Amino acid sequence: MTFRDLLSVNFEGSRSDGSAGGASAGGSGGGSGGAAASEGRAVDGVPGTAGSGGVVGAGSDENNRSSAGEPGAAGAGGEVNGTAAVGGLVVSAQGVGVGVFLAAFILMAVAGNLLVILSVACNRHLQTVTNYFIVNLAVADLLLSATVLPFSATMEVLGFWAFGRAFCDVWAAVDVLCCTASILSLCTISVDRYVGVRHSLKYPSIMTERKAAAILALLWAVAIVVSVGPLLGWKEPVPPDERFCGITEEAGYAVFSSLCSFYLPMAVIVVMYCRVYVVARSTTRSLEAGVKRERGKASEVVLRIHCRGSSTGTDRGHGAMRSTKGHTFRSSLSLRLLKFSREKKAAKTLAIVVGVFVLCWFPFFFVLPLGSLFPQLKPSEGVFKVIFWLGYFNSCVNPLIYPCSSREFKRAFLRLLRCQCHHSRRRRRPLWRAYGHHWLASNGGPRPDCAPGLGAAPREAPLALPAPEATDTPSAPEAQAPVVGRRKPPYSFRDWRLLGPFRRPTTQLRAKVSSLSQKIRAGSAPCAEAPCALRSEVEAVSLNVPHDAAEGATWQAYELADYSHLRETDI
């Protein structure tokens, strides 16, 4: 039984003239004539003028297409079973149930996609290029859920299109636009994940915000080109009945839209994820083997600055510099493994999304061109409606996949449901944590320049380092290191607070590391005393990983006074 047949209302009644009234289902007779009973599809129904069971009939032609009929005549004893009158329309109990189910379905799709968009907007650590593509997917699904599905559900419940021919064409075009944009977004995400897994360390420089914006603009341009075809006349002849509205089944357009909206993107998606699987399998083995050779996994990330003496370097200094080379190798290997594991996990999450997408959309894009080219192979109306709504179901299920597969999205969802959005002031836990006092360990001892004795450098001439931003946890009481003789540079366009939510964490990390490196290379303020006999020059700044407690203990610890005002810095 199709959705339109759910509106069928059967009643038996005797006419005032003694003849049998027609079984009114919106067909050619709701009591309007003759002894012969007629059946049809409900198109428009209004309670009869005199009979208890009379409804406004709708005439039916040989193809069982509906047209407005005449009010039913008087009928005695007419009875309507299992129906409800809503605004003058008679709807069966099953139709009411279908309407409630579709309303819950639409509300779930709207709420889920809104959660995805707000989660990225309110959490800085989720504002990455990959998540921008996910937000674009959520925007397309939200537009579909809010502008297309309500009218589709209304048509299913009423059994006919009640919004006019012009709006039918617009509705069909927006339907194709949103579905195509959603599918192309999944295609873009798969390419982005392949780049992230294949080039995990170079990914921030390869996939920039500017490139992402250009890709998204091209994506929506392609979706618009695919969707405007029927508006420009590439469609079937317009049916005379304005109460009928459906997707265009013209053979040429059906094949074109299926290729551009589904088959080509699906081919790219399958190829990209096959490549992701191959790269992930080989890279994981090589990285894990390298880390095992270097004894264990990363426990802590620290900043080590490799220095060399500008005049007479001691053996101790050269030994310290040589010993850090192994640490640098191990840290880069471990950091690469950690970075790659995050990329691989994100790829797994998005692979689930793509798998569900294929299951939801493949039946529709298989049946549509097949039925257009070979009408005799068309499925029944009921089967086609199930396949049609299965594609819509993809827009509802995408937001449900993220919290089940991504811990970060799950936490963001929970914070939003608890009305906790800390985007403006509170900072997330830093991805990297650098300890400035390890500069002393790398140099083989306290910095000697501008030092009056064997102790640390005087507090009047500290090494200028960027102070950490305010965090949720209180830090140790340390004085802010002044910068002598330097004017604060003006803010650049990228430093405006207005653009803060659109900056990637990797961009902030790179900027802070560069600033830290430049300030360390510049050294402290000019010293009023004689030039130091032994002055060190920074050779490199790197992130190192101690692999066990014993190795971490070999790095010399210093008291707070020996830090030369180097403080823990979040980068």
Swiss-Prot record:
Its main location: membrane. Keywords: Cell membrane, G-protein coupled receptor, Glycoprotein, Lipoprotein, Membrane, Palmitate, Receptor, Transducer, Transmembrane, Transmembrane helix. SMART domains: 7TM_GPCR_Srsx. Palmitoylated. Palmitoylation by ZDHHC21 may increase the expression of the receptor and regulate downstream signaling. Residues 121-132, 192-212, 275-348, 406-571 are cytoplasmic. GO terms for molecular function: alpha1-adrenergic receptor activity. Residues 13-75, 465-487 are annotated as: Disordered. Residues 19-34, 48-57 have a biased composition (Gly residues). This is Alpha-1D adrenergic receptor.
